[in-house]
């Protein structure tokens, strides 16, 4: 049903640093496999061919321990802070926190922050963290506004470390029927706008 399909248009893409160290093909693999977009609402999250149980999956209560740790403001919204850690430290899970507006009976998550524990072996990745922000649409559905992933890596022992970041901002959400339904026949859920790689830093 095309009315339920989603499409993201990438208006601006900017890279700095990595493109000076890796060739174009290696860069593509790096972004698709390491700095890939993560859907925290999936039961499993795959990073570097390693499957992690999402803290928001159906089996999360069996896999994670949850603690009510604080009440804080996220932007201007007063939220309850819930901390989660794997029940078994040796399993593939995240540590982190999510924030739910005080009094929200739907348990809508406004922000989630999570990281891969340092004692988990992820090949050359020494540290990886994810932060995502959401707002509630008028119909109650969730809209992702910010997706921020940072990592620390060391490609070979004894070499300098690498710091990488993928910061994505979403806006202009539009629920009107697509003016050209054929846009959904192109495959995938993202379209790169013409000239996206050449936008200025102030775009």
Give, region by region, the residue ranges found by the protein language model.
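Short, small-residue-biased leader/transition segments that mark boundaries at the very start
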Residues: 2-9
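Low-complexity, polar-biased intrinsically disordered regions enriched in Pro/Ser/Thr/Gly
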Residues: 3, 155-160, 186, 191-193
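Long, low-complexity, polar/charged, intrinsically disordered or flexibly structured peripheral segments
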Residues: 10-48
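Short acidic/polar alpha-helix capping motifs at helix-coil junctions
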Residues: 29-33, 61-65, 95-98
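Edge strands and adjacent loops of beta-rich recognition modules
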Residues: 39-73
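Gly/Pro-enriched, hydrophobic low-complexity segments
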Residues: 53-55, 67-68, 73, 77-183
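Interface/linker segment at the passenger-translocator junction
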Residues: 181-203
